[in-house]
């Protein structure tokens, strides 16, 4: 060996190895799935590169994975004749984890072994899973197209460092040898290894072969026996594929240890010819909100792998969807740039988007419990849909779930169809309120009249909700109405005011004028309202005015926030309003009005510019 050097692992690798060995040991056989899956990916990459450079096959175009073991040496070897790696690639791929957010991901792991196991599996351990059962791993590899003397040797005990060196390797591809730990003899058993390969690799298009040794005429004859079906799962007839095979294929392409929630396998012929296999995961990826999070489908053209993470086939609000598309209409030399401007891509994207929305609608209809799992994991992402995809807005709206005054629970389980089915006779609008929290929404004074009338209100408390409702203007022909904005339909709901009450209100006109004079430009208007039952005052905004929640969103994003001018509404039947109206002393009157306004602002915004002044004012009035 030449050019030998010992290097230290990236700190995150050391941490991941330690956590992984302890968290995944109960499911240790998955190392074989991960290593065979990597070998399959290496074959896919070679096929793709060989489209433009057939010489990379080096006269050996029969791609396969081989598994062998040596009971005496206690080693298990997985080899492929795929694309292989250069020295730099070995250091990059086997010595570091090139994923943004790795550090924060590792910090999120705790003492819950079952949960950590799911997260680590989701992270994609790949090659490192070998250390679950091995106390030393040796890699010999040579990149396709390189000379034999440009082979690379890599070895590590999975602790703090690894050794890398130059070697001569005649055949292209990668060979990984696991030196098994004491007690891992099951992976030296022919039947056990065969059963694992059958379980995890039937769906892989690449032949997976196991070494077969037979004694003939006093000599040991070595042959290779294919274990898996070696037919791409998505090319098979749906009726021939078991649920277990679909689940294992998902784990192979998504590098996820969890079963998917649901899937859809379709072959389309006619104007466009393609096959799609789309999965909805059961758990959100750990880095879903990371700006660099990779998403998209695996793209095949006429069964030839082209690229991972082809995000052009799925809108951003469906970025959680995993799976693949195999198209007959795209060229084999397609690039990401060509995909961006392709009519074929746009048509496929539209068709696949509709397919996913139909899949989710079916899941919601057939299995409400599973759909609730989906909503808890991906609901916030789906809420981006109404703004992004106007063409499918109604279909997306059907999939949304909300908390509401009907259920009296913070769980988001109410669909818009549920709400519409319960609308009161003569009710024309879908009422909702946005707030910082479920508790704030539920206790808002804006709900008082609607509660009294038995009218349901949707309680929205996710940060994205206010933004979403700017785009989601109606459902089933019924407009949405924020109860914190002034609206004629809300005033109509108020009880009919009798003549004596009208006379009493007329008598309050001078009081309203005094309040207007005192507050001046600080409010847009001052008026009496019959929308309140228990609260003395509220602030609301005009229909065309920026809402409180939208102003908060702007502020959180560091943008300049235009001043929100509120309408100050007073309840003429409330004792505090009557007391203020009866106060002749201007200083005391000012204190009462300011207190009522601060209370209304606090209920609306959750904060005050000067909370200490509010407390002093309230204390003074309490003791006066």
UniProtKB/Swiss-Prot annotation:
It is found in: Cytoplasm. The keyword Transit peptide does not apply. Residues 553-624 are annotated as: C. One of its GO terms (cellular component) is cytoplasm. Belongs to the heat shock protein 90 family. This is Chaperone protein HtpG. The gene is htpG. SUPFAM superfamilies: ATPase domain of HSP90 chaperone/DNA topoisomerase II/histidine kinase (SSF55874), HSP90 C-terminal domain (SSF110942), Ribosomal protein S5 domain 2-like (SSF54211). GO terms for molecular function: ATP binding; ATP hydrolysis activity; ATP-dependent protein folding chaperone; unfolded protein binding. Keywords: ATP-binding, Chaperone, Cytoplasm, Nucleotide-binding, Stress response. Its main location: cytoplasm. NCBIfam families: PRK05218.1 (NF003555). It comes from Escherichia coli O139:H28 (strain E24377A / ETEC). Gene3D superfamilies: 3.30.230.80, 3.40.50.11260, Heat shock protein 90, C-terminal domain, Histidine kinase-like ATPase, C-terminal domain. Residues 337-552 are annotated as: B.
């Amino acid at each position: 060996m030449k050019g030998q050097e010992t290097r230290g692992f990236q700190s995150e690798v050391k941490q991941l190895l330690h956590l992984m060995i302890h968290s995944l040991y109960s499911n240790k056989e998955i190392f074989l799935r991960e290593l065979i899956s990597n070998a399959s990916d290496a074959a896919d990459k070679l096929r793709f590169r060989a489209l433009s450079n057939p010489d990379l096959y080096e006269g050996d175009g029969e791609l396969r994975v081989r598994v062998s073991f040596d009971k005496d040496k206690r080693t298990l070897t997985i080899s492929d004749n795929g694309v292989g790696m250069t020295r730099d690639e070995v250091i990059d791929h086997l010595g570091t984890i090139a994923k943004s957010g790795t550090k924060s991901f590792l910090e999120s792991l705790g003492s819950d072994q079952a949960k950590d196991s799911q997260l680590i599996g989701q992270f994609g351990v790949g090659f490192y899973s070998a250390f679950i059962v091995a106390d030393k791993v040796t890699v010999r590899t040579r990149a396709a197209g390189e000379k034999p003397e440009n082979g690379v040797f890599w070895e590590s005990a999975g602790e703090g460092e690894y050794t890398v060196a130059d070697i001569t390797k005649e055949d292209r591809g990668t060979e990984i040898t696991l030196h098994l730990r004491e007690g891992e003899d099951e992976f030296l058993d022919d039947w056990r290894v065969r059963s694992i390969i059958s379980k995890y690799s039937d769906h892989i298009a690449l032949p997976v072969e196991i070494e077969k040794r037979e004694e003939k005429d006093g000599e040991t004859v070595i042959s290779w026996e294919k274990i898996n079906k070696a037919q791409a799962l998505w090319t098979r007839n749906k009726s021939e594929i078991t649920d277990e095979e679909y689940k294992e294929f998902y784990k192979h392409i998504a590098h996820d240890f969890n079963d998917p929630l649901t899937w859809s396998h379709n072959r389309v012929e006619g104007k466009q010819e393609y096959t799609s296999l789309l999965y909805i995961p059961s758990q959100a990826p750990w880095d879903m909100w990371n700006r660099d999070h990779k998403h998209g489908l695996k793209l095949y053209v006429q069964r030839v792998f082209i690229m991972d993470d082809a995000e052009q086939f799925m809108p951003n609000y469906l970025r959680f969807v995993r799976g693949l598309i195999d198209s007959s209409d795209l060229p084999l030399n397609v690039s990401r740039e060509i995909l961006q401007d392709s009519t074929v891509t746009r048509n496929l994207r539209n068709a696949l988007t509709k397919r996913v929305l139909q899949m989710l609608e079916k899941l919601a209809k057939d299995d409400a419990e599973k759909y609730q799992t989906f909503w808890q994991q991906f609901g916030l992402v789906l809420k981006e849909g109404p703004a992004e995809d106007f063409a499918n807005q109604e279909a997306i709206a059907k999939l949304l779930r909300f908390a509401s005054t009907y259920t009296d629970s913070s769980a988001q389980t109410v669909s818009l169809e549920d709400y519409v089915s319960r609308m009161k006779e003569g009710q024309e609008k879908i009422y909702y309120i946005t707030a910082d929290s479920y508790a704030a929404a539920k206790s808002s004074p804006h709900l008082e009249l609607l509660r009294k009338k038995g009218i349901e209100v949707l309680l929205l408390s996710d940060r994205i909700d206010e933004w979403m409702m700017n785009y989601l203007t109606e459902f089933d022909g019924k407009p949405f109405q924020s109860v914190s904005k002034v609206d004629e339909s809300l005033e109509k709901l108020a009880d009919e005011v009798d003549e004596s009450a009208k006379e009493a209100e007329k008598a309050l006109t001078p009081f309203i004028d005094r309040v207007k004079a005192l507050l001046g430009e600080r409010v847009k208007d001052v008026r009496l309202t019959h929308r309140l039952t228990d609260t003395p005052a509220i602030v609301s905004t005009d229909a065309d005015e920026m809402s409180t929640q939208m102003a908060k969103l702007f502020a959180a994003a560091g943008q300049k926030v235009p001043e929100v001018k509120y309408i100050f509404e007073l309840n003429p039947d409330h004792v505090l309003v009557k007391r203020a109206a009866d106060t002749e002393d201007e200083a005391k009157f000012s204190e009462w009005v300011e207190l009522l306004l601060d209370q209304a602002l606090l209920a609306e915004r959750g904060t005050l510019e000067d909370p200490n002044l509010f407390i002093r004012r309230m204390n003074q009035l309490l003791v006066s």
